[in-house]
Amino acid sequence: MMKKKTAAGLFGGVIFLLIGGVYVFFKHESGMPESLSIGNTAGLSARQQSLLQQPALPADSEIAKLVVRKAVREMDAYDTQGRLLKTYPVALGFNPVGHKQFEGDGKTPEGRYIINDRNPNSGYHKNLGVSYPNDADRTYAAAQGKSAGGDIKIHGMRNGMGAIGAQHLHRDWTHGCIAVTDGEIDELYALVKPQAEIEILP
């Protein structure tokens, strides 16, 4: 009986350590939400769920401009004629209020930039690069004796964690990037035109 209890205790301890390791990884390494649900839209607002249920855009769509509205955690995609094609719910930097000024401040930039890069082999599924910092950003940071930072992307989930899906929306978790689900970055990666404009509003 004692052996059975000992084995059960050891098994329980292993499970506890595994769960604890996952918790630490999410909290420290990726900044992802601490509590995740398998249900893709569980616990999200009606607005977020509605946006997530939108159909895929036609394969011949062209996205010429993106507008991120930080206050409501949404990103609008417009075609070459200025028509709204789709709105995506997003997560932002872990310290999202205000314009990004320095490396490591956790803020998502504000202002007008372009999509200047794309990476199909990102550590976060795929990504589209945002042209932050611009000259004004670099000049301001340098005047303070600091780096403006950079490497701002629109990206999906950390590789191997795509199943998190829309649950990432429960919390702003990036280091300044704009996060969407893997399916959404697949769509954006395919349809956003090179050098497309991106405007990021407060």
Region roles according to the model:
Residues 1-15:
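N-terminal Sec-pathway targeting helices
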Residues 5-9, 117-202:
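Exported/periplasmic cell-wall-interacting domains
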Residues 16-26:
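Hydrophobic alpha-helical membrane-insertion segments, chiefly the h-region
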Residues 27-44:
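Ser/Thr/Pro/Gly-rich low-complexity linker/stalk segments immediately outside membranes or between
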Residues 47-65, 71, 88-116, 135-140, ...:
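N-terminal post-signal-peptidase region of extra-cytosolic proteins
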Residues 61-63, 70-73, 83-87, 108-110, ...:
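Extracytoplasmic
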